[in-house]
A protein has these predicted regions:
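Conserved catalytic cysteine-centered active-site region
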Residues: 58-112, 132, 143-151, 212, ...
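Flexible glycine-/small-residue-enriched beta->alpha junction loops
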Residues: 2, 107-160
Length: 260
């Protein structure tokens, strides 16, 4: 029988724009994540020597997020030196997969107490910084029918029959729900303010939610992946899905978040 697994607590940083103009641009990834470990230790008066492992997902594990960033974060938070750390990359599912693996470790009886999550600072380590065969090897890309994720999303929308207006309406409702949750305190216990080395608060709550977004406003934006699609990726998609009409580009890329 698997050992029962419980998530005891969940915390994150507030989110801001994932560009150099974002509020958290000056904060290093290891400081973002270490602040959360420090808060967990204080909140539960945790003897960190009991932690069996820290598992962290990271999509671009290079530069300031490179090496084994999970272990770097453990050290930066000044947890017990016996606590190990492991970094994993499953693209956008990296943080979730870290939690899955932590649960598997406990369920198997191998370990008892595991901290899991993810760290990513897109304002300091831009998406695609780590390269890879998909990005830099055209022969591999054609062989595997690779297209960028955004074009993949637009292909799914085309196959499923979702219109541009459908996804714009969903985007608007998502912004409104996020603002409602923030403004009504639903995130208060889980969002941990980011502070500088002097203890001064840099960001206390999510500052890039846009509740005033409208379907009409979004309709005026150009699809983000229409141009890359016309440069050859559409041909790759249509070769794989030969019954598909031309890809309908519905996907909009707004500036993304930075946080943990």
């Amino acid at each position: 029988m698997p050992t029962p697994v419980y998530i005891y607590d969940a915390v994150r940083t507030p989110r801001s724009k994932g560009k150099s103009t974002g509020t958290l641009h000056e904060v290093k990834p290891i400081d973002l994540a270490a602040g959360l470990l420090v808060e967990l230790q204080k909140r539960h008066d945790l003897d960190t020597s009991y932690v069996d492992d820290v598992v962290m997902g990271c999509v671009s594990p290079v530069g300031e997020q490179g090496s084994d960033v999970a272990k770097m974060v453990v050290q930066n938070a000044e947890w017990d030196e016996s606590v190990p750390g492991v970094q994993l990359d499953r693209f956008c599912a990296s943080g979730l997969e870290a939690v899955n693996i932590a649960a598997q470790k406990v369920a198997s009886g191998w370990e008892d107490l595991v901290v899991a999550g993810g760290v990513e600072s897109m304002s300091r380590v831009p998406m695609g910084s780590n390269g890879g065969a998909m990005a830099g090897d055209p022969e591999f890309a054609v062989k595997t029918s690779f297209v960028p994720q955004g074009i993949g999303a637009d292909t799914i929308a085309t196959l499923a029959g979702w219109s541009r207006e459908d996804v714009d309406q969903y985007a608007v409702s998502s912004q409104q729900r996020a603002a409602n949750a923030r403004d009504n305190g639903w995130f208060d216990r889980s969002v941990i303010p980011v502070k500088d080395s002097s203890g001064v608060t840099i960001l206390e709550r999510d500052d890039f939610i846009k509740p005033d977004t409208t379907v009409e406003g979004l309709a005026g934006l150009k699809p983000s992946f229409e141009v890359p699609g016309s440069m050859g990726f559409d041909d790759v998609i249509l070769a794989k899905y030969n019954t598909l009409d031309p890809v309908s580009y519905t996907h909009l890329t707004l500036p993304t978040s930075v946080g943990v």
